[in-house]
Amino acid sequence: MGIFDWKHWIVILVVVVLVFGTKKLKNLGTDVGESIKGFRKAMNDDEKPADPVVNPVPPAQPVHPQATQPITERRTFDVQAEKVEEPTRKDS
């Protein structure tokens, strides 16, 4: 038999109907049905063959970046730092 007998399922069904009401259960059933229908449609769309992919035309000559010399000298920037004012509250 198992844990739940048919009598247990009837009691559970009655409690669910009393808690949620028939209108909410009907709406829930409709929403679940529409979700399943959308899922099946998406699965069928995936099974259809896709449009043929157009291969892009390769460039005439491959682009090779020119080699550059590494930077050997040190560079510094002369800047002057400015002090930032502390923020003040305007509502006090």
UniProtKB/Swiss-Prot annotation:
Subcellular compartments: Cell inner membrane
Biased composition range(s): Basic and acidic residues: 72-92
Coiled-coil annotated spans: none
GO biological-process terms attached to the record: protein transport by the Tat complex
Pfam family, one: TatA_B_E
Transmembrane segments: 1-21
Membrane topology category: Single-pass membrane protein
InterPro entries: TatA/B/E, TatA/E
Region feature (Disordered): 44-92
Record carries keyword Transport: yes
GO molecular function: protein transmembrane transporter activity
Gene3D superfamilies (alphabetical): 1.20.5.3310
Subunit structure: The Tat system comprises two distinct complexes: a TatABC complex, containing multiple copies of TatA, TatB and TatC subunits, and a separate TatA complex, containing only TatA subunits. Substrates initially bind to the TatABC complex, which probably triggers association of the separate TatA complex to form the active translocon.
Function comment: Part of the twin-arginine translocation (Tat) system that transports large folded proteins containing a characteristic twin-arginine motif in their signal peptide across membranes. TatA could form the protein-conducting channel of the Tat system.
HAMAP family (alphabetical): TatA_E
Family of the protein in this entry: Belongs to the TatA/E family.
Protein name, entry field: Sec-independent protein translocase protein TatA
